């Protein structure tokens, strides 16, 4: 059967919170089959566990924020994206603040951490959410949509009307049957505009944001001396975010995702719309790994890496 996966050993790192500017400790621990991805606020007098789920996402203005009984863990999408890309089903994520450290602004550090810990198959079938009917959410000219598809592919289009962004690829389509997440998506960094960063700092946010963990743009150009990691890094990062946003549903999707100018809020609304229609999806497993979509087999310790 196609099996669930966790990590082999505990692994730790320290990074900066993009909003608080504080030093944050992050520990990844193996978890039993059926656990899912569980975030734990170990800095609190009594640690609080928050399982990743579509219904636990609260605030989506600047990141995907998991919430439970007034306790928050923010900026989970890059780590969730790495877990999706590497096929991690079960994991405990201990964090000493209300946000996951930003690291370099991409998913690459989290991929490295997980690969350093090692990936282990577990004796339980991997559960997929198979989309059976189209589901779509719109907000003005923005939209996000899921269609039935035997595999996992995404098509994302952006439109920032900024000279430096417009010079790069605005549209990207990726099918993970033939594309490496680690090589083609994981290193794409978050990006922001210098004038917005100043406004955010004035209200106590983005205190840890810098060119070490983001692509920063002024009105005309990219300010980072080293430029871009990919020619189409902007749209690739939006896709990286979408992969993480979608993975909070708790299982890998068998679906085709299409989006135009979507963000964390629209992605979460799409998951909620899917879950609201029980006839639009089903949970499936694969007794024969060869019968699963290409890209999900336990190959080179990755999912579609």
Curated annotation (Swiss-Prot):
Pfam families: LpxC. GO terms for molecular function: metal ion binding; UDP-3-O-acyl-N-acetylglucosamine deacetylase activity. Belongs to the LpxC family. Catalyzes the hydrolysis of UDP-3-O-myristoyl-N-acetylglucosamine to form UDP-3-O-myristoylglucosamine and acetate, the committed step in lipid A biosynthesis. Its cofactor is Zn(2+). Signal peptide: none annotated. It catalyses: a UDP-3-O-[(3R)-3-hydroxyacyl]-N-acetyl-alpha-D-glucosamine + H2O = a UDP-3-O-[(3R)-3-hydroxyacyl]-alpha-D-glucosamine + acetate. Zn(2+) binds at residues 78, 237, 241. Pathway: Glycolipid biosynthesis; lipid IV(A) biosynthesis; lipid IV(A) from (3R)-3-hydroxytetradecanoyl-[acyl-carrier-protein] and UDP-N-acetyl-alpha-D-glucosamine: step 2/6. HAMAP family: LpxC (MF_00388). The active site is at 264 (proton donor). Its EC number is 3.5.1.108. One of its GO terms (biological process) is lipid A biosynthetic process. This is UDP-3-O-acyl-N-acetylglucosamine deacetylase. The keyword Ubl conjugation does not apply. InterPro entries: Ribosomal_Su5_D2-typ_SF, UDP-acyl_GlcNac_deAcase, UDP-acyl_GlcNac_deAcase_C, UDP-acyl_N-AcGlcN_deAcase_N. Keywords: Hydrolase, Lipid A biosynthesis, Lipid biosynthesis, Lipid metabolism, Metal-binding, Zinc. It is an enzyme of class 3 (hydrolase). The lineage of its organism: Bacteria, Pseudomonadati, Pseudomonadota, Betaproteobacteria, Burkholderiales. The keyword Iron-sulfur does not apply.
